[in-house]
Structures are given as structure tokens and as C-alpha cells.
UniProtKB/Swiss-Prot annotation:
<feature type="modified residue" description="Phosphoserine">
    <location>
        <position position="386"/>
    </location>
</feature>
<keyword id="KW-0812">Transmembrane</keyword>
<feature type="transmembrane region" description="Helical">
    <location>
        <begin position="62"/>
        <end position="82"/>
    </location>
</feature>
<keyword id="KW-0472">Membrane</keyword>
<dbReference type="InterPro" id="IPR007311">
    <property type="entry name" value="ST7"/>
</dbReference>
<comment type="similarity">
    <text>Belongs to the ST7 family.</text>
</comment>
<keyword id="KW-0325">Glycoprotein</keyword>
<protein>
    <recommendedName>
        <fullName>Suppressor of tumorigenicity 7 protein</fullName>
    </recommendedName>
</protein>
<feature type="glycosylation site" description="N-linked (GlcNAc...) asparagine">
    <location>
        <position position="47"/>
    </location>
</feature>
<feature type="transmembrane region" description="Helical">
    <location>
        <begin position="15"/>
        <end position="35"/>
    </location>
</feature>
<keyword id="KW-0597">Phosphoprotein</keyword>
<dbReference type="Pfam" id="PF04184">
    <property type="entry name" value="ST7"/>
</dbReference>
<dbReference type="GO" id="GO:0016020">
    <property type="term" value="C:membrane"/>
</dbReference>
<keyword id="KW-1133">Transmembrane helix</keyword>
<feature type="transmembrane region" description="Helical">
    <location>
        <begin position="512"/>
        <end position="532"/>
    </location>
</feature>
């Protein structure tokens, strides 16, 4: 019964929609019939005569004023359209036409849309959740004191935005603090330090936290039950204070490494103590989770220091050990650091093994994963690749695999090739990136450009094939090929993450809609005609009459430019030019 009632309601709705479609025609004929019947009481004939007489009495100045007014209105519409397009990326009139006028004029298949919505509701919700712009911590981020601040000292430019640094402060509060920090004076100070905006205030707070730990405290624990001998202990060092000093105060990588080694001693001790007490309650469990994050962060940054200082093999070993010890902590994306270090060692077999583990359909992708896979496949054929030879004989299987890998990488992040091919200048990468955005492209190319240059012919193959990706995805914002449609929000988020002196790469490149171009041309042409008519009324009148004769005459093909100009001279009575006189010596 319920299904029958539902079917009857759907049929009734379709009948109502069908009747409304043709009811407009009925109303139109009814209005025409009423006008015809009431033509005498309404004095329609007299009104038409009055209107025609009024139009006949209008002077050319009225038409000039009317043309100027229409040009002004068109210009205002053009300015509004341009502003709306710059702000929202679409034409206002086109959007209104598509959203409101098309359903009224062309109709919409409600049944099919309802069915598609009901059947694809889950997939649409999943797509929206996946395509939502999420900002990620840059796994290859630089050191503020040793790298970012030195860039500022040399160039006078700030490489980090306030939004980016604010995200880092939130990350530090999440990773390095817990609810029980107020019980320990040093941790309480550091909890406030991570929220400080002023770098000098943060550094001073870190030094204060370390000074507190230097104070000896008497712990009244007798070594022997019936003895009066007491044990003197030192408060445990504050590992997070060393982290802050290594990140922001150290001016060289070597100084940062020394501070991180001190942080490792303190962090390892705190981690072992909290590991023994983690099952005693939720408070101890949260403290152990915090100590785990601190220890992983310290070891990862020590590996990055070794990589910066040229000890690449040592860095690889530290990263492998860290991934084995903490396999579940994927939020730091240590495998991307490992891939970059292995590429520096040219250990391509090890790189392939890491990709086989992390380039999985169930795991989130990144530019490092996609472009490293493309680099490995391009390495097998790039040294012998020639576009002329490929056009003659076609692509081999290995070349086809390399091209498909490049297309896959470009579809995921289309901004990277311009940086790898040095078509666009690089800047220092931000501390946070947006997947598939310009910020991720900068972070990848900053560290991996040297690896692409090291593989002979890889950049040439990329240069010849990367633009072919866009033929497979003509509408990247609506439908993708191997990935979800390109998210619309990347440009806005990248502008917040990247400094103002950098020109953000936009994909797909926005082109002005035809309506804006047409309105601009029509407005300019009309304004020019109005100005010429106002300044040269006689000449424009002759020109208009000549043009009307050309288009209205049956013999317009026999006319030529000479006859037109002769007629203009006769009408305006232009005097002949004076003959030049030759001066004799």
C-alpha cells in the first residue's frame, strides 16, 4: 500500500508539472484575447498614435543621450561582473541563468535527479569529505632559526605567513602538551610558551623552564628503611624546552643538532617513566601519548639534521629505526623523509620497496608518492627517449608506463611540473601544505628538483608529456580521471599559506566568460560611436547614410572604398589640398 501511495503521489506531481508547462501558453492567449476585446475601452489605438507621434518628434540629441546612458549602464554591469568573477570565479549572469532560468525554460528531469541523488548519496557525501581542503604538516619543513630566519636576515622578506605559524602553534600544543602539565612547573611554562606569538617571549620561556630544572629538590625517600640517609635527585630535564630552542634560537643546523641531542636524553627518560605508568589511569595515558609524540619528533628532526649535514646514510638508518619502533604514527609522514634521503643515495631499489608499501589505494596520496613513482618509471626510458622517434614508431610499453605515471602525477598535483622545469621560481616551502595545491608543489620541488636533474632525460620526458594530462580531464573541477575532481578551495588556502610576494599558481586557469568579453566589446563600441556622433555629427551622419546604402542596395558588391570617400568629400565640400611649392636656390 505504501508503495502504491508513493507511486500515485509521484504521478500526481508529474501531472502538475506537465500542466504548469503548458499553462503559460494558455495564459498568453488569454491575455491576447483580453487586449483585443478591451481595445476600445482602453483606447489602445489612440495611445499607439500618441506614442508614434512622440517618437517622430525626437531629435538626434535624444538618441545620443540614450546611447550614452546605455553605455554607462553597460559599463556598470561590466564592472560588477568583473568584481563578481574575481571574487567567486564565475559570472553572475551565467550563474543566475543556469541556476534559475534554465529550470524554468528547459525544465529539469526531477525523477532522474531524485533517483540519482538517492542512489549516489553515499558516494557524494564521501566525495565531499575527501575533497575537503585539509592542511597537512609539511614533513620536510625547514628549521625556523637556522633556515627561515637566515633567509629573512638576508632578503628582508618573511617566508612564513601568520596563518602558517598559527597552525604550527596549534600543532605544538597538540603534540607537546597534556592536561597534567600544570602539575610540573617547567611543563606549565612551556604550555604558555607554545601559545606566545612573540618569538623572543617563547625563547625566554624555554630558558626559564630549563632554569627551573636546574634547581635541586630534596626527595624524602630513605635509601634504607631505618636509616637517616636521604637521596638527592635532580628534576627531569624539559625536553620540549630544548625542542623550542633548537627550532627557533639555533642559527645553524649543527647547533640545532646539539640541542636536539640534549632533548633526546630528556625525552627518552620521560618516555620510559610514562611507559611504565600508562596503565594506571587516563591521566598517565595522556602523558605517555604526549611523551611518545615528543620522542618521535626529536628523533625525526635529528635524522633531518643528519641529512642536512651530509650524513645521509646515518639519516636513513635513523628513519628506518623510527618507523620500525613506532609504525602507527603516520601523522609525521616519515616515509616521505626516507624517500628523499634514499633518492639522494640513488638507492632506487629501496625507493621502489618503500613505494610498494605506501603507494596503496587505501592510503592518502601525496606529490612525493606520485612524482617519485613517475621518476622511477621515467628513469628506465628517459635516457633513450626522443619525441621524434616516438612519433615515428610509437611508444613502447615501458615508455607508455612512464607517460601514464607522469599523467597520474600531474593529475594529482598539476603545479609541480612548472617548478621542476624551472618555468616558475621557487621559494622556501611553508611549514604546512595543502594536498594537490601550490604549497605542496613548492615543498616537493624544493627538495626533489636535484633528484630529477640527476636522472638523465627525466626532465625532457616530463617536458614532452605533462601537458597531455589536461586532454584527459577537460573539466577537472567536475570529474577526474584517476583521482577525485580537483578541489575548488585550493587557491584560497594556498594564498593563506604562501607569502604575499609569491604568485600563487591557479589550476585550472580561469578564463573570462564569453558574456564579460561580449559586454566589454559592446560597451566600448557603443561608447565610441556615441562620442564620435557627439563630436562629429555631420561626418557620422554621412557615414551612417553611406553604410545604409551599402547594406540596403542590391548592387552593394559593386561599391568600393573610393566611391564612398568621394561621396563624403562632396557632401562636406572638403577643399582640395594646396599644391606644394618648390623652392629654388
Amino acid at each position: 500500500m505504501a508503495e502504491a501511495a508513493t507511486g500515485f503521489l509521484e504521478q500526481l506531481k508529474s501531472c502538475i508539472v506537465w500542466s504548469w508547462t503548458y499553462l503559460w501558453t494558455v495564459w498568453f492567449f488569454i491575455v491576447l484575447f483580453l487586449v483585443y476585446v478591451l481595445r476600445v475601452p482602453l483606447k489602445i489605438n489612440d495611445n499607439l498614435s500618441t506614442v508614434s507621434m512622440f517618437l517622430n518628434t525626437l531629435t538626434p540629441k535624444f538618441y545620443v543621450a540614450l546611447t550614452g546612458t546605455s553605455s554607462l549602464i553597460s559599463g556598470l554591469i561590466l564592472i560588477f561582473e568583473w568584481w563578481y568573477f574575481r571574487k567567486y570565479g564565475t559570472s553572475f549572469i551565467e550563474q543566475v541563468s543556469v541556476s534559475h532560468l534554465r529550470p524554468l525554460l528547459g525544465g529539469v528531469d526531477n525523477n532522474s535527479s531524485n533517483n540519482s541523488n538517492s542512489s549516489n548519496g553515499d558516494s557524494d557525501s564521501n566525495r565531499q569529505s575527501v575533497s575537503e581542503c585539509k592542511v597537512w604538516r609539511n614533513p620536510l619543513n625547514l628549521f625556523r632559526g637556522a633556515e627561515y630566519n637566515r633567509y629573512t636576515w638576508v632578503t628582508g622578506r618573511e617566508p612564513l605567513t601568520y596563518y602558517d605559524m598559527n597552525l604550527s602553534a596549534q600543532d605544538h600544543q597538540t603534540f607537546f602538551t597534556c592536561d597534567s602539565d600544570h602539575l610540573r612547573p617547567a611543563d606549565a611554562i612551556m604550555q604558555k610558551a607554545w601559545r606566545e606569538r612573540n618569538p623572543q617571549a617563547r625563547i625566554s620561556a624555554a630558558h626559564e623552564a630549563l632554569e627551573i630544572n636546574e634547581i635541586r629538590s630534596r626527595v624524602e625517600v630513605p635509601l634504607i628503611a631505618s636509616s637517616t640517609i636521604w637521596e638527592i635527585k635532580l628534576l627531569p630535564k624539559c625536553a620540549t624546552a630544548y625542542i623550542l630552542l633548537a627550532e627557533e634560537e639555533a642559527t645553524t643546523i649543527a647547533e640545532a643538532e646539539k640541542l636536539f641531542k640534549q632533548a633526546l636524553k630528556a625525552g627518552d627518560g620521560c618516555y620510559r617513566r610514562s611507559q611504565q605508568l600508562q596503565h594506571h589511569g587516563s591521566q598517565y595515558e595522556a602523558q605517555h601519548r604526549r611523551d611518545t609524540n615528543v620522542l618521535v619528533y626529536i628523533k625525526r628532526r635529528l635524522a633531518m639534521c643528519a641529512r642536512r649535514l651530509g650524513r645521509t646514510r646515518e639519516a636513513v638508518k635513523m628513519m628506518r629505526d623510527l618507523m620500525k619502533e613506532f609504525p602507527l604514527l603516520s601523522m609525521f609522514n616519515i616515509h616521505e623523509n626516507l624517500l628523499e634521503a634514499l633518492l639522494e643515495l640513488q638507492a632506487y631499489a629501496d625507493v621502489q620497496a618503500v613505494l610498494a608499501k605506501y603507494d596503496d589505494i587505501s592510503l592518502p596520496k601525496s606529490a612525493t608518492i606520485c612524482y617519485t613513482a613517475a621518476l622511477l618509471k621515467a628513469r628506465a626510458v628517459s635516457d633513450k627517449f626522443s619525441p621524434e622517434a616516438a612519433s615515428r614508431r610509437g611508444l613502447s610499453t615501458a615508455e607508455m608506463n612512464a607517460v601514464e605515471a607522469i599523467h597520474r602525477a600531474v593529475e594529482f598535483n598539476p603545479h609541480v611540473p612548472k617548478y621542476l622545469l624551472e618555468m616558475k621560481s621557487l621559494i622556501l616551502p611553508p611549514e604546512h601544505i595543502l594536498k594537490r595545491g601550490d604549497s605542496e608543489a613548492i615543498a616537493y620541488a624544493f627538495f626533489h628538483l636535484a633528484h630529477w636533474k640527476r636522472v638523465e632525460g627525466a626532465l625532457n620526458l616530463l617536458h614532452c608529456t605533462w601537458e597531455g594530462t589536461f586532454r584527459m580531464i577537460p573539466y577537472p573541477l567536475e570529474k577526474g580521471h584517476l583521482f577525485y575532481p580537483y578541489p575548488i578551495c585550493t587557491e584560497t588556502a594556498d594564498r593563506e599559506l604562501l607569502p604575499s610576494f609569491h604568485e600563487v599558481s591557479v589550476y585550472p586557469k580561469k578564463e573570462l566568460p564569453f558574456f564579460i568579453l561580449f559586454t566589454a566589446g559592446l560597451c566600448s563600441f557603443t561608447a565610441m560611436l556615441a562620442l564620435l556622433t557627439h563630436q562629429f555629427p555631420e561626418l557620422m551622419g554621412v557615414f551612417a547614410k553611406a553604410m545604409s546604402d551599402i547594406f540596403c542596395s542590391a548592387e552593394f558588391r559593386d561599391w568600393n572604398c573610393k566611391s564612398i570617400f568621394m561621396r563624403v568629400e562632396d557632401e562636406l565640400e572638403i577643399p582640395p589640398a594646396p599644391q606644394s611649392q618648390h623652392f629654388q636656390n
